[in-house]
Amino acid sequence: MAIRLEDKKAIVAEVNETAANALSLVVADARGVTVGAMDTLRKQARESGVRLQVVRNTLAKRAIEGTDFECVKDALVGPSIFGFSMEDPGAAARLFKDFAKEQSKFEIKALSVGGKLLEAGQIDALAKLPTLEQALGQLASVMIAPVTKLVRTFNEVPTKVTRVVAAVRDQKQDAA
């Protein structure tokens, strides 16, 4: 089915806008994956802030020109599904990695973060990135740890004095 030129321009503009606002991109080949499984993937993508798009490669190549994801052009061979992470850089990688475990025919082709092309085998590195909430929690615990240690140190001095006084008292009672 032929697509009109105006429609092609609209598709390119939409994908370009998505790519310009995305934090990371994962490209996969979904040949052989059932429609039901793809519907499940789309539902999970919506829940995790990932934008899925299936676009012809020629249109996709034009759409990602001038964006951080221009480096994935060479991976655009055959049918491709694009997963753009809009809020969390590792969201699309986690989603595609988990889906690939369930669907043996789902193959990850390439991924990109910050203009760098990563091989499909490096998806674990991107998938293991903490979410924003996890990163903030880790930062808070690192910042609170020295203060907590200082408070414990201050509390330790009176505790030691109390133990010494109790030991002297017990010693005097035993001597009496």
Curated annotation (Swiss-Prot):
Keyword tags: Ribonucleoprotein, Ribosomal protein, RNA-binding, rRNA-binding
SUPFAM superfamilies: Ribosomal protein L10-like (SSF160369)
Pfam family name, one: Ribosomal_L10
GO CC list: large ribosomal subunit
Gene3D superfamilies (alphabetical): 3.30.70.1730, 6.10.250.290
Protein's GO biological process: translation
Homology family: Belongs to the universal ribosomal protein uL10 family.
Protein name: Large ribosomal subunit protein uL10
Organism: Saccharophagus degradans (strain 2-40 / ATCC 43961 / DSM 17024)
Lineage: Bacteria, Pseudomonadati, Pseudomonadota, Gammaproteobacteria, Cellvibrionales
Gene symbol of the encoding locus: rplJ
